[in-house]
Amino acid sequence: MKDRFELVSNYQPQGDQPKAIDQLVKGINEGRKHQTLLGATGTGKTFTMSNVIKEVNKPTLVIAHNKTLAGQLYSEFKEFFPNNAVEYFVSYYDYYQPEAYVPQTDTFIEKDASINDEIDKLRHSATSALFERKDVIIVASVSCIYGLGSPEEYREMVLSLRTEMEIERNELLRKLVDIQYARNDIDFQRGTFRVRGDVVEIFPASRDEHCVRVEFFGDEIERIREVDALTGEILGEREHVAIFPASHFVTREEKMKKAIINIEEELEERLKALREEGKLLEAQRLEQRTRYDLEMMREMGFCSGIENYSRHLTLRPAGSTPYTLLDYFPDDFLMVIDESHVTIPQIRGMYNGDQARKQVLVDHGFRLPSALDNRPLRFEEFEKHIHNIVYVSATPGPYELEHTPEMVEQIIRPTGLLDPIIEVRPIEGQIDDLIGEIQQRIERNERVLVTTLTKKMSEDLTDYLKEIGIKVTYLHSEIKTLERIEIIRDLRLGKHDVLVGINLLREGLDIPEVSLVAILDADKEGFLRSERSLIQTIGRAARNAEGRVIMYADKITNSMEIAINETKRRREQQEAYNEKHGITPKTINKKIRDVIRATHAAEDQEEYQVKEEPKLSKMTKKEREKVIAQMESDMKEAAKALDFERAAELRDLLLELKSEG
């Protein structure tokens, strides 16, 4: 079992990083429960945390407040720890409509979801890694506090296979079905197995390329091989292999029987209560739905929406804490909360929203009351999982300030870049003044971010700037994640010179080409102009040596004063450090493709694209066969998904490649 973290980097800790690393490591080793890393934008907080993880050498959970940020962190940690298990655990839904009921219109909305198979694979990879090794970093979104199956049950259901082990072939098949693998001799994919005489091939739920081939001689396993699922190429011999369940909600047969009895008892009690209240329609609805689920569980071992019965399946008492990803970690793991000023309030709010929706379903006979126990953790339950935690933020929130009176500061940037100079200018004539500033930046091939207070103002300003010939675009909340990434990329490439937005110019928008951030109506106190929002927005100009911030305001508010003073304090520290060490600030030179790559989580290998024709002449015979096999598989997948244009494109290319070969 591998159990040491190996940090791979061309950089050494610089500036404030060595001091911050030492303080955090010392705090963890001394058993300090809560610590906060107050890290200014661009000071290399991820690199600092990577060094801390390496030094304390504990399994680590990193929680981010959205999938995009989690994907960015996943990519960065994967680069720093290429020889360790860096995993990704976010919600596997591309689209999710939870079941709900609107009593006013008597409308029941069925659960509707589209599951991303790649992310499901990564979730299984994350949980199995925790049972197999200690050098694990899991980057997760807040979905990690939602219910998952029992870790003990999951561990007990792992199928351990060894060479020379005595087991009947049919018994192995039964055990695979018990852990929710499906037999499919034709469409072999993740979470399935196929049988060919004395050979059983298993496609683990945590993989997408390699499968396990188990060869029998009588009632004994003669050989275990790892095989390329696409080409059939043998990759190696194995003495032992562990097959993890294909679902996190797996239950042994005897537990399932007990759970079914308990569900039936609860159903009878609930039906009696509903009938006594005169809710006959609700009682009929509940009985019909629950009995159908019970029949499915008896016959198949699972049903649609089985997570709503998770309390019974794990034999937990009513109201008890559900199992989550946090229970899969050992007791002394390290937790890191990224952008904690946003993530902590998000964790706090999850429980109430979930309960409000489910209570309506219970009241109107769509679910049993036990469905309320399939829920995210309450905040106090989440706190019980904290052993060592590091909050990471440029602007720590009240919770972090309360629990960590002493901050670990990281103000100095390794690049020598300073926090930007801030000017306050009057609101009267702000647009004309702004246009003059934009023109100066365009001449120097630099970019500008403008933040407004309302959607209408953003749209009007964008239209006005377009009319006078400025290349401008508008970023708003309705733009999808990938479109947003494209817009940021186009800004960096110079297709746009100005980006206008409302609350979108804060966390995670690191664009070195931006030399000016303009904050309109800076003196309007509120969420968008609070001290934290202002400091985060100011930080967007800290990646450029010419960084400036202009606040348009008629008076200096308390929030403005705090933000200006904090920025000034940091800048003075940075200037003193640069002077002492003879450092000249230089704008970060960040490759433009990094912006895109960092946000496509878990894409270790570039997807095969039709436009990028493989050069067959430069390939070996084996490589050529693999490319052709992959294309055939892609063509069939496209046809199955009714994407016939893509399938035809692949077919034509395939014929061309085969004729060349």
Swiss-Prot record:
Gene3D superfamilies named among the record's database cross-references: P-loop containing nucleotide triphosphate hydrolases (3.40.50.300), UVR domain (4.10.860.10)
Role, per record: The UvrABC repair system catalyzes the recognition and processing of DNA lesions. A damage recognition complex composed of 2 UvrA and 2 UvrB subunits scans DNA for abnormalities. Upon binding of the UvrA(2)B(2) complex to a putative damaged site, the DNA wraps around one UvrB monomer. DNA wrap is dependent on ATP binding by UvrB and probably causes local melting of the DNA helix, facilitating insertion of UvrB beta-hairpin between the DNA strands. Then UvrB probes one DNA strand for the presence of a lesion.
Organism, scientific name: Bacillus licheniformis (strain ATCC 14580 / DSM 13 / JCM 2505 / CCUG 7422 / NBRC 12200 / NCIMB 9375 / NCTC 10341 / NRRL NRS-1264 / Gibson 46)
GO molecular function, one term: ATP binding
Principal subcellular localisation of the protein: cytoplasm
Protein's cellular compartments: Cytoplasm
Gene Ontology biological process terms in this record: nucleotide-excision repair; SOS response
Keywords noted in UniProt: ATP-binding, Cytoplasm, DNA damage, DNA excision, DNA repair, Excision nuclease, Nucleotide-binding, SOS response
NCBIfam families attached to this UniProt entry: PRK05298.1, uvrb
Keyword Nucleotide-binding: yes
Domain named Helicase ATP-binding: residues: 26-413
InterPro entries (UniProt xref): Helicase/UvrB_N (IPR006935), Helicase_ATP-bd (IPR014001), Helicase_C-like (IPR001650), P-loop_NTPase (IPR027417), UVR_dom (IPR001943), UVR_dom_sf (IPR036876), UvrB (IPR004807), UvrB_inter (IPR041471)
Domain UVR: 625-660
GO cellular component labels: cytoplasm; excinuclease repair complex
Binding site residues for ATP: 39-46
Domain notes: The beta-hairpin motif is involved in DNA binding.
Domain Helicase C-terminal: 430-596
Descriptive protein name: UvrABC system protein B
